């Protein structure tokens, strides 16, 4: 059985959309077209957006990560674009129960001089969620340049040091791009030299997640053979993350006892330390011809975790569904 409805929280002026496919339930919001909840068989899998990090699954557009000095040069003019772009902080237009669009406007053009439409859609089928991004260059004459990526955070008590990420294939040639942690204009940028990714992996497949795993920010992998990774928490695979349409996989969490891990599919990267600041020179920048579209997606397959919390969460979901239906009646 598949159905959907809208819940209006008037006191917060935020509209949420809930989609249900048998045992998998997701909630999204128009602000950032962001996921706010993923429940499978009554258990929450998405970070709550409260402790340590106030986001949950932001869209990275039209840049991924940091720009050198926080700005870039496009067609001879300097533009300031915030870390991970501006889309995650803008309100999208809802165009369907599970679809949103952000269109270029005066605010976006002041930061990014391209005309575009960014579509975000969520599809659920059985125990799998697919997140789809479609970018359309709406200009008739000019090629559009942009980067894009995802940043979902999944519940995982990695600080207990019982968690790991397993690559689907043996990774013989995988590389890691270190994040530069030296204070100054190059802070948070990609280092020019890569590291053998095998130094991070056990038996060519296992990335053990420890308390100090993210002391140097994200672990950014490139030249990945696997199409998917598994997130294992306390001896159980909780999800399978498929990102084969992207060039990089960033893995990150906040320092401390943060109860989540982010799996970040990136098409492009932050600026490198030796960046020229020219947007057109960014590594793997997407060049989209006039009136053309670029579609890219990733998917998450969820596995049932039976221990603890399920009954309460299912009752809570049933109450939420009842409230939503009552609101619709009025």
Residue ranges and their predicted role:
Residues 26-28, 120-122, 129-137:
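Short, well-ordered beta-strand segments enriched in hydrophobic/aromatic residues
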Residues 304-318:
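C-terminal GPI-anchoring signal of eukaryotic secretory precursors
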Residues 24, 40-41, 79, 84, ...:
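Acidic/His-leaning functional-site neighborhoods
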Residues 153-156, 160-243:
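Active-site/ligand-binding surface loops and adjacent short beta/alpha elements
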């Amino acid at each position: 059985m598949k159905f959907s409805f809208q819940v209006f929280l008037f006191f917060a002026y935020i509209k949420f959309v809930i989609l249900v496919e048998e045992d998998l339930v997701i909630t999204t919001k128009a602000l950032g077209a962001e996921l706010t909840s993923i429940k499978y068989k009554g258990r929450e899998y998405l970070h709550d957006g409260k402790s340590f990090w106030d986001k949950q699954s932001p869209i990275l557009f039209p840049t991924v990560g940091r720009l050198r000095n926080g700005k870039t040069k496009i067609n001879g003019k300097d533009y300031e674009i915030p870390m991970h772009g501006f889309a995650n902080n803008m309100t999208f237009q809802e165009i369907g129960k599970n679809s949103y669009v952000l269109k270029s406007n005066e605010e976006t053009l002041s930061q990014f001089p391209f005309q575009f439409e960014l579509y975000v859609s969520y599809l659920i089928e059985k125990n799998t969620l697919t997140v789809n991004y479609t970018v359309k260059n709406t200009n008739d004459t000019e090629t559009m340049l942009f980067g894009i990526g995802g940043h979902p955070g999944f519940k995982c008590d990695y600080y207990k040091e019982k968690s790991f990420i397993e690559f689907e294939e043996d990774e013989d040639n995988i590389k890691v791009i270190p994040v530069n942690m030296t204070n100054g204009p190059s802070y948070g940028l990609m280092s020019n030299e890569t590291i053998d990714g095998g130094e991070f992996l056990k038996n060519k497949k296992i990335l053990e997640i420890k308390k100090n795993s993210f002391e140097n920010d994200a672990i950014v992998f490139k030249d990945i053979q696997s199409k998917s990774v598994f997130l294992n928490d306390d001896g159980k695979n909780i999800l399978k993350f498929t990102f084969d349409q992207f060039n990089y996989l960033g893995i990150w969490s906040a320092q401390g006892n943060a109860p989540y891990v982010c799996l970040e599919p990136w098409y492009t990267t932050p600026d490198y330390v030796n960046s020229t600041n020219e947007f057109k020179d960014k590594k793997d920048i997407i060049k989209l011809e006039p009136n053309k579209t670029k579609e890219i997606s990733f998917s998450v397959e969820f596995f049932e975790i039976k221990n603890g919390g399920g009954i309460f969460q299912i009752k809570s979901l049933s109450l939420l569904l009842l409230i939503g239906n009552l609101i619709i009646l009025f």
